[in-house]
């Protein structure tokens, strides 16, 4: 066992040499920022001030040359090979959030379009799940490997959890959900997890960049903003391939009902009848906002989209600390198990 000391907080924890530094931190109750836990989103970057680490294989591609020169490491992928002295900002908002495992009942299965299902789960009345809008959970079934899904509804007193699940062609779990799962079935969930959530202490205008079912956690955050009566200016950019992939009318309803919410759908494979924004969703953001000084950006979707959005936004004066992301990466299990 090695000792990992965080310069920022002055607190330390023990970490085994066969677990990631992030796993060691989380198992000891430390609220380090993280997202996908697969090495794609980059949310768990930290500075290694002293000590040795190792990766199982190549250095993760999400670490740039500048990151490596600055002794940045990806805590979800690296393992301690000596005592470590690191620098990472812990998240106070997560201090009261407890990761729990519990059974839940399938309440509703609603097809939102050809390849997205809205799954409504009911938590037993004797239990509760405290979470922050934007976080995700593990969905577990005894016959399949678990999968991460973002919670798509804002925290309320309700014991219902909403998930948006896209069909993965070769995915065993998603095919089971689409074709065999029935109401009243029992599944298990473990969560909440992740550091993709609203920074409520800020008054900055917000740009949401959602790709596909990345709309789910964004929906939860916007619902939370509405529930708390926030007047922060919100710009929602939702990028999909074609119009049929815009599987919810809620963004249009929000923009009509609330003067502080604007909705900009972006199609990458638009047909000739589409007169809205076309191309990559992050390009539409930069076209509308050449200077992102004073904004917060929340991006959720495929890693390629999130990484492109981060690069573009930082090149247009967004402060690095104001970019928050969650990458939907299916590498936590193989395609055969998804």
Regions found by a protein language model. Give the residues of each.
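Iron-sulfur (Fe-S) cluster-binding segments and ferredoxin-like electron-carrier domains
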Residues: 20, 24-33, 43-92
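Short, charged beta-turn/beta-strand-edge "cap" motif at the junction between a beta-strand
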Residues: 92, 143-145, 191-196
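Ferredoxin-reductase
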Residues: 98-186, 204, 240-242, 266-270
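FNR/FR-type flavoprotein reductase catalytic core
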Residues: 166-338
């Amino acid at each position: 066992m090695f000792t990992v000391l965080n310069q920022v907080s002055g607190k330390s924890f023990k970490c085994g040499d066969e677990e990631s530094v992030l796993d060691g931190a989380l198992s000891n109750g430390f609220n380090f920022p993280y997202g996908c836990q697969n090495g794609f989103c980059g949310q768990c970057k930290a500075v290694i001030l002293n000590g040795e680490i190792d990766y199982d294989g190549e250095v993760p591609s999400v670490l740039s040359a500048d990151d490596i020169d600055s002794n940045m490491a990806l805590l979800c992928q690296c393992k301690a090979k000596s005592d470590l002295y690191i620098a990472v900002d812990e998240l106070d908002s997560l201090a009261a959030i407890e990761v729990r495992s519990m059974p839940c009942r399938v309440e509703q299965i609603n097809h939102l379009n050809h390849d997205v299902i809205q799954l409504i789960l009911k938590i037993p009345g004797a239990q509760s799940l405290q979470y922050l809008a934007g976080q995700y959970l593990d969905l577990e079934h005894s016959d399949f490997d678990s999968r991460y899904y973002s919670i798509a509804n804002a925290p309320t007193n309700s014991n219902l959890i909403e998930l948006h699940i896209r069909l993965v062609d070769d995915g065993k779990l998603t095919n089971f959900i689409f074709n065999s799962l029935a109401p009243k079935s029992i599944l298990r969930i473990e969560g909440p997890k992740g550091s993709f959530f609203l920074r409520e202490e800020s008054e900055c205008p917000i740009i949401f960049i959602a790709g596909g079912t990345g709309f789910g956690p964004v929906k939860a955050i916007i619902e939370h903003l509405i529930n708390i009566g926030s007047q922060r200016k919100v710009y929602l950019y939702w990028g999909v391939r074609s119009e049929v992939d815009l599987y919810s009318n809620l963004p249009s309803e929000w923009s009509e009902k609330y003067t502080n919410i604007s909705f900009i759908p972006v199609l990458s494979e638009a047909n000739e009848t589409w007169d809205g924004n076309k191309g990559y969703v992050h390009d539409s953001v930069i076209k509308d906002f050449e200077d992102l000084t004073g904004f917060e950006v929340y991006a959720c979707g495929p890693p390629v989209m999130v990484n492109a959005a981060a690069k573009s936004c930082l090149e247009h004066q967004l402060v690095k600390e104001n970019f928050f992301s969650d990458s939907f990466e299916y590498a936590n299990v193989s395609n055969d198990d998804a």
